[in-house]
Amino acid sequence: MSLVLDSSVTLAWVYSAEATVAVSDVFARVIESGAWVPALWRLEVANVLEMGVRKGRTDAAFRDAALADLALLPITVDAETDRHAWGATAKLAARYRLTLYDAAHLELARRRSLPLATLDPELRAAAAAEDIILIGA
């Protein structure tokens, strides 16, 4: 079964020193069954990697290699993220006091009836309240 992947798990995998067994298991599952992400996921991931370059955490070669590796994974970008932004996503953000970015992952998991892979404690709490299966921690 596929899953919804957020940037916290993605970046923990990219920065392998931060990867746990659970994070590695998520990516084994992504390789096997694929993942869904909201339309903003690529921007979130690329932004953190770019900020890492600017702050001297990594270099441009690391950033580029990480993005190239991620591009090879069977990850489907949801084409309906923006359609739900001002409706279901905004309501979830308000209900659980999430950013709209985090609520987009929650909305996608709920809409597609998929488990959610996140390390974010607030998003995990909201997903649990919505009876969404959680993985990755």
Regions found by a protein language model. Give the residues of each.
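Entry/capping segment at the start of metal-dependent catalytic domains
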Residues: 45
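Alpha-helix capping/helix-boundary segments
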Residues: 10, 41, 84-85, 105, ...
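Short, well-structured N-terminal submotif of metal-dependent ribonuclease cores
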Residues: 1-40, 52, 57-65, 130
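Short beta-strand scaffold positions
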Residues: 37, 100-103, 118
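Acidic, PIN/NYN-like endoribonuclease modules and their adjacent C-terminal/linker elements
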Residues: 2, 106-137
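Amphipathic alpha-helical protein-protein interaction surfaces
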Residues: 19, 97-98
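Acidic catalytic patch
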Residues: 39-42, 62-94
